[in-house]
Amino acid sequence: MVKEITDATFEQETSEGLVLTDFWATWCGPCRMVAPVLEEIQEERGEALKIVKMDVDENPETPGSFGVMSIPTLLIKKDGEVVETIIGYRPKEELDEVINKYV
C-alpha cells in the first residue's frame, strides 16, 4: 500500500533504499489516474521499492525544495539521492522501465 507522508516525515521515509515519491493533489485529474498504477506497482514490487505520496497543498515545503512546478511529479531516490524525476502521467509500462534502471 502506498503511504501518505508529510514535510516532517519526508527525509526519514525516503533516505534508504529505492523510494518513489508521488507529489499530488486531490483536485488533480492526472494524479488520480496515476494513483492506481502506483498501487499496482507497489503490490508487484513489494520490498524492492517503497512508494510514498505527498499532498502538495498540505505540504508545500518539500515539493518547493525540489522545484516541483507541475503535478503529478514522481521523484525517485536511491539511498537518499535523487536519481530520476518524472513529470505528468505515465503508463505502467513506462514507469516499470524507469524503475528497472535502479532495482
UniProtKB/Swiss-Prot annotation:
UniProt domain Thioredoxin: residue ranges:
1-103
GO terms for cellular component: cytoplasm; cytosol
State the Pfam families in the record.
Thioredoxin (PF00085)
| GO BP term, example | cell redox homeostasis
Q: Which InterPro entries match?
A: Thioredoxin (IPR005746), Thioredoxin-like_sf (IPR036249), Thioredoxin_CS (IPR017937), Thioredoxin_domain (IPR013766)
Keywords from UniProt, A to Z, are: Disulfide bond, Electron transport, Oxidoreductase, Redox-active center, Transport
Cystine residue pairs = C28-C31
Provide a Gene Ontology MF annotation, just one: protein-disulfide reductase activity
Function according to Swiss-Prot or TrEMBL: Component of the thioredoxin-thioredoxin reductase system. Participates in various redox reactions through the reversible oxidation of its active center dithiol to a disulfide and catalyzes dithiol-disulfide exchange reactions.
User: Of which family is this protein a member?
Assistant: Belongs to the thioredoxin family.
Q: Per its record, how is this protein called by name?
A: Thioredoxin
What species is given as this protein's source?
Answer: Listeria monocytogenes serovar 1/2a (strain ATCC BAA-679 / EGD-e)
